[in-house]
Amino acid sequence: MQIWAGLGNPGPKYALHRHNVGFMACDVIAEMHGFEPVQKKFQGWVQEGRIGSEKVLLLKPGTFMNESGRAIGEAMRFYKLEPQDVTVFYDELDLEPFKIKVKRGGGAAGHNGIRSTIRHIGEDFRRIRIGIGHPGHKDRVTGHVLGNYAKAEQDDLVQMLGAIGAEAEWLAKGDDARFMSDIALRLQA
């Protein structure tokens, strides 16, 4: 079993924020792969399903971004999993908008949701970094991260999220390179 956690803030007023792109990714994966209905569990919302032959628990922590690790840690301990069995989808300022990078381990790079996750489960989990771009000046970062995607970005957002969902089987199989490569090819078309 694997846990795939999407980071974001709960509630409708945050739904389209760039900071919630991890939640959006989980929603698309659940829809595209026919996951079970949402249940309230582990201080958040979960959906169970299969991607290929792998059982996956999608988790959207309800603890707000800065405490995301509490929910992820609780789910990981309940299922007696290791950090290597956890994948976290989140927004990344240091990547161009709609670019995807996968990495394992490392620090938080200023991301409070990742910092919380590290605090609760350690560093050795897989991260799906979803680019939101940097607004240019550090004074504009908070407004950018906590701002909605612009109308002009909606098509690119939908295309990127669809690519994540369509290529999720490579993640489930542990083929991170193929996941990134196939997403890049889809987004070029």
From Swiss-Prot:
UniProt site (Stabilizes the basic form of H active site to accept a proton): 91
Question: One matching Pfam family, short form?
Answer: Pept_tRNA_hydro
List the cysteine pairs that form cystine: none
InterPro entries recorded: Pept_tRNA_hydro, Pept_tRNA_hydro_CS, Pept_tRNA_hydro_sf
Query: Matching PROSITE patterns, A to Z?
Result: PEPT_TRNA_HYDROL_2 (PS01196)
Indicate where this protein resides in the cell.
Cytoplasm
Q: Report the EC number(s), separated by commas if there are several.
A: 3.1.1.29
Sorted alphabetically, the keyword list is:
Cytoplasm, Hydrolase, RNA-binding, tRNA-binding
Q: Look up the record and give one Gene Ontology term from the biological process aspect.
A: protein quality control for misfolded or incompletely synthesized proteins
This molecule's function is given as: Hydrolyzes ribosome-free peptidyl-tRNAs (with 1 or more amino acids incorporated), which drop off the ribosome during protein synthesis, or as a result of ribosome stalling. Catalyzes the release of premature peptidyl moieties from peptidyl-tRNA molecules trapped in stalled 50S ribosomal subunits, and thus maintains levels of free tRNAs and 50S ribosomes.
Return the HAMAP family for the record: Pept_tRNA_hydro_bact
**What is the name of the protein in this document?**
Peptidyl-tRNA hydrolase
Q: What is the lineage of its organism?
A: Bacteria, Pseudomonadati, Pseudomonadota, Alphaproteobacteria, Sphingomonadales
Gene name as annotated = pth
